UniProtKB/Swiss-Prot annotation:
This is Uncharacterized protein aq_427. It comes from Aquifex aeolicus (strain VF5).
Length: 121
């Protein structure tokens, strides 16, 4: 697993938990419940040191982090384009080729992950 795949797995986990909490109407009790236990980086990337100091994030903070992102990165994360095919991303964002679509997805995941990492610091 390379670093981007690890970041993508963390973003997927955070968004999965966020969507489950949103669907289950847990948003009214945000201050009481934690959402996500982050994966340990030492297990997935043995040559890297763990950068997470806290392992909990709340749904209200996920919403705030998504709102901090600029377009089109916010749309890629919010509508889960990182799980879609590159053809779909290319068509929906009006890009020239799959390479541009891949870099848009990669940049979106990296930005969201960096905001999460700063949240945990």
């Amino acid at each position: 697993m390379n670093l981007f795949e690890y970041k993508l797995s963390v973003v997927r986990q955070v968004m999965d938990k966020y969507e489950v909490a949103e669907e289950a109407k847990f948003i009214s009790g945000l201050s009481k419940g934690s959402m996500v236990n982050a994966l340990s980086r030492k297990k997935k990337l043995p040559n890297k040191e763990a950068k997470f100091t806290r392992y909990v994030i709340y749904t209200v903070d996920v919403e705030r982090i998504i709102d901090m992102m600029e377009e089109p990165y916010r749309t890629v994360i919010k509508k889960r384009y990182y799980d879609a095919s590159l053809d779909t991303v290319k068509k929906d964002f009006g890009l020239q080729n799959k390479r541009e679509a891949y870099f848009l997805v990669k940049k979106s995941v990296n930005k969201f992950y960096d905001l999460l990492e700063n949240y945990w610091k």
